[in-house]
Design a protein with these regions (language model features):
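Loop/turn elements at helix/coil->beta-strand transitions in domains of secreted/extracellular proteins
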Residues: 93-96
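Acidic/His/Gly-enriched intrinsically disordered linker/tail segments
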Residues: 1-81, 91, 101-142
């Protein structure tokens, strides 16, 4: 399972629960916090300055499972993963996202499951959907 999905989905659904209980403004506050989480990490990188190519490399680097320690040092997976999870939910809905999660129980490469469920390969999805959205959100939300 890619690190960005594990941490991003946790943030997405956690933020949904908070928003349900305390109002939509809390979702926006939590989203901002998640997106800026990387600033507490030790990379020294500024995601808001990334080019499309740098975003692609960055997202590919978050595909690993990291054996339980999903990106705790640099803290990239939380905000990036939240935004990618928002895109998955917006484009495919809850059912497809749950089908994608269930696919990790199969003896199948997750990239193939992604293509089967979303009808696009992961790299194309990064370039056509995910990266444009992530870049817009990092400009919009400071």
């Amino acid at each position: 399972m890619p690190c960005w999905l594990r941490e991003g989905s946790a943030n997405l659904f956690g933020n949904f629960v908070f928003a349900e209980k305390y109002g939509v403004n809390l979702y926006n506050q939590a989203k901002r916090g998640d997106m800026n989480n990387y600033q507490w990490g030790s990379s020294g990188q500024e995601l808001r300055k990334f080019t499309e190519s740098e975003w692609f490399t960055h997202l590919k680097s978050l595909e690993g499972n990291f054996q339980g320690g999903c990106d705790y040092i640099y803290r990239f997976a939380y905000g990036s993963g939240l935004l990618l999870s928002e895109v998955l939910m917006a484009e495919g809905g809850f059912e497809k996202m749950m089908n994608f999660w269930r696919s990790f129980a199969l003896e199948k490469d997750w990239r193939l499951s992604f293509k089967d469920i979303y009808a696009v390969d992961i790299d194309t999805w990064y370039r056509q959907s995910a990266i444009p959205y992530v870049m817009r959100e990092y400009v919009r939300i400071q």
